[in-house]
């Protein structure tokens, strides 16, 4: 009897290994990119849906940008990424940027807003947009850049009330990031082609 019990114990299968902790999966490239685009306050940037929280956004204007690549159409986004842009006389667009989706964005820091009151960023964007609903659009003097400048002045971004179209154009050129390679090509290729044509024609006439 003892031998039978000993034999049965020897025939029992080995116990299963103890459960291990679940392995942590490495983040995918898309997840890594999304973390890089993560906005302040936990609101994520979404290029496909044109959501750029706390950003100034820019897109090329057909023909005009072909000759002057640093000149384009500008808007400013709310804390949730909704774009507001002065799109024409007495009209400020919401979530439907004139001239197409943004090609470039300039990420700002909401901690640099010095205006008092709750939700100062969105309040400034709203007040600037309401003001420009009563203004005539002027390409040279009072345009989309001026609308964005007013919003930044109202919120006292970087503790300044001296924002204007020139400073915005410069900082957007310096700190702006293209949303994709295609956006970069869309902005600069027409200018490069036109420049090439002008140089070629000039060279041909000089060689005659």
From Swiss-Prot:
Q: Where is this region: Disordered?
A: 1-26
**What InterPro entries does the record point to?**
TMEM222/RTE1 (IPR008496)
Outcome of residue 148 to M? In NEDMOSBA; uncertain significance
Summary of the tissues where the protein is detected:
Widely expressed. The highest expression is observed in the brain.
| Stretches assigned to the Cytoplasmic side | 77-164, 208
Topological category with respect to the lipid bilayer? Multi-pass membrane protein
For this protein, the parts annotated as crossing the membrane are 56-76, 165-185, 187-207
Task: Please indicate the ranges of residues that lie on the Extracellular side.
Answer: 1-55, 186
Identify the domain of life: Eukaryota
Which is a Gene Ontology cellular component entry for this protein? dendrite
> Where is this gene product found?
Membrane; Cell projection, Dendrite
- Coarsely, its chief localization is membrane
Q: Mutating residue 176 to R leads to what result?
A: In NEDMOSBA; uncertain significance
Per UniProt, the keywords (alphabetical) are: Cell projection, Disease variant, Epilepsy, Intellectual disability, Membrane, Transmembrane, Transmembrane helix
Annotated Pfam families: RTE1
Please tell me whether the keyword Cytoplasm is annotated for this protein.
Answer: no
Looking at the record, which disorder is this protein connected with? Neurodevelopmental disorder with motor and speech delay and behavioral abnormalities: An autosomal recessive disorder characterized by global developmental delay, impaired intellectual development, speech delay, delayed walking, and behavioral abnormalities. Some patients develop spastic tetraplegia with inability to walk independently and never gain proper speech. Affected individuals may have variable additional features, including poor overall growth, hypotonia, tremor, ocular anomalies, seizures, and non-specific dysmorphic facial features.
Task: Please identify the protein, giving its name as recorded.
Answer: Transmembrane protein 222
Q: Which organism is it from?
A: Homo sapiens
